[in-house]
């Protein structure tokens, strides 16, 4: 059996890591296509080595652009790749423009399409990710859902017969990374002289929070007003936006820092008092590590983190400060995202449903 995985952004490569391992263990031929949707200096050889990801077989080098330009460029390039490899499955990951392009190319050329992380819904149609994930689910021959909530969304949309719950592959990666750290010191703590448990780790990147200068300024001011240091792992795009509008990302308690490699990020979150983010991935990672999280959004796809008390949605400066300052949540043994073996189930389901 042959699978072609299409990925283009760092979170997708993290999800790819356990899939690559499981495919190799099952003797499945696995072709990795890197669209180059996001230029990310963290996607270095070290990143691939740390997570055990094989080097991509194909680099498209699409780069940045508007949603239409980027999606169209990826779509145009994928047609020839799929025809060359004639896969038994095209595997699309998550909710990026690379995801949507892979879906459209696969179905137009009549190659079976599987969607990993299917069924997630924010119900916010302003988010480009929401369009991408909904369209990909409805194009897919097999929807690989991470949670029971996601399965419910798929059933509600008439996709129950083509859906299966496998768990969350991010859980696989996180548990492996956590265990490999085994009490090792955090690079961030050592570099900045931080006291473990007495600082917050933050990431802010969504357009709703960064494209409007007034919105970005009020978030920065709120984080800067907190009692403990807030280390903002700022993407170059956010740094450029802030600089263009005279917004200081190092003010009060707020300290801007470059993004971290995945193992270093997990070590930093483990050492922190809490996480503050608008990222879907970090909300879930914080929950799995049992680190409190504040999400600067009015909604989340990962509703289990909120229902179990480890994540609070906060959209105004006042809500952000109150949420970050809240007491530690009640302990829970709940495991809504699986047991760390989702990738094995993904490969097993692809083999089982092979046409």
Give the ranges of each region predicted by the language model.
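Active-site and donor-binding regions of nucleotide-sugar-utilizing enzymes
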Residues: 4-7, 13-24, 47, 59-158
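Donor-nucleotide binding loops and adjacent catalytic segments primarily
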Residues: 37, 45, 65, 182-271
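A nucleotide-sugar donor-handling region in carbohydrate enzymes
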Residues: 38-42, 61, 139-211
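Leloir-type glycosyltransferase catalytic cores
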Residues: 48, 149, 312-355
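Short acidic-hydrophobic, aromatic-tinged amphipathic segments that line or gate anion-handling sites
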Residues: 60-61, 145, 165, 256-258, ...
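Glycine-rich phosphate-binding loop signature in dinucleotide/nucleotide-binding domains
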Residues: 81-88, 194-195, 271, 353
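A donor-sugar binding/catalytic signature common to diverse glycosyltransferases
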Residues: 92-93, 143, 267-305
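Nucleotide-sugar donor-binding patch of glycosyltransferase catalytic domains
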Residues: 287-331
């Amino acid at each position: 059996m042959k699978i072609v995985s299409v990925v283009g952004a760092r979170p997708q490569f993290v999800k790819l890591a356990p899939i690559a391992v499981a495919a190799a263990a099952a003797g499945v031929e696995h072709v990795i296509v890197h669209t180059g949707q996001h230029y990310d200096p963290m996607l270095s050889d070290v990143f691939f080595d740390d997570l055990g990801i094989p080097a991509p077989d194909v680099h498209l080098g699409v780069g940045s652009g508007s949603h239409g330009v980027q999606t169209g460029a990826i779509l145009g390039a994928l047609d020839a790749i799929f025809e060359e490899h004639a896969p038994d499955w095209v595997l699309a990951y998550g909710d990026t423009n690379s995801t949507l392009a892979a879906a459209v190319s696969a179905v137009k050329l009549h190659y079976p399409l599987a969607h990993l992380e299917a069924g997630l819904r924010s119900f916010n149609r302003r988010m480009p990710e929401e369009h991408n994930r909904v369209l990909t689910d409805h194009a897919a021959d097999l929807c690989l859902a991470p949670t029971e909530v996601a399965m419910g969304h798929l059933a509600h949309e008439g996709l129950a017969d083509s859906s299966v719950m496998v768990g969350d592959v991010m859980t696989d990666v996180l548990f492996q990374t956590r265990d490999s750290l085994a009490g090792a010191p955090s690079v961030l703590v050592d570099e900045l002289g931080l006291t473990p448990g007495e600082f917050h780790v933050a990431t802010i990147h969504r357009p709703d929070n960064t494209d409007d200068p007034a919105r970005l300024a009020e978030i920065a001011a709120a984080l800067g007003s907190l009692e403990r240091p807030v280390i903002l792992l700022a993407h170059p795009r956010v740094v450029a936006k802030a600089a263009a509008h005279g917004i200081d990302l190092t003010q009060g308690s707020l300290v801007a820092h470059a993004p971290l490699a995945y193992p270093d990020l997990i070590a930093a979150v483990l050492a922190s008092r809490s996480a503050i983010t608008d990222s879907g991935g970090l909300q879930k990672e914080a929950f799995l590590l049992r680190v409190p999280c504040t999400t600067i959004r009015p909604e989340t796809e990962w509703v289990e983190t909120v229902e179990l008390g480890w994540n609070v949605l906060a959209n105004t400066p006042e809500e952000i400060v109150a949420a970050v300052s809240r007491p530690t949540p009640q302990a829970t043994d709940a495991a809504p995202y699986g047991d760390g073996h989702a990738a094995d189930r993904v490969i097993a389901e692809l083999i089982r449903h092979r046409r």
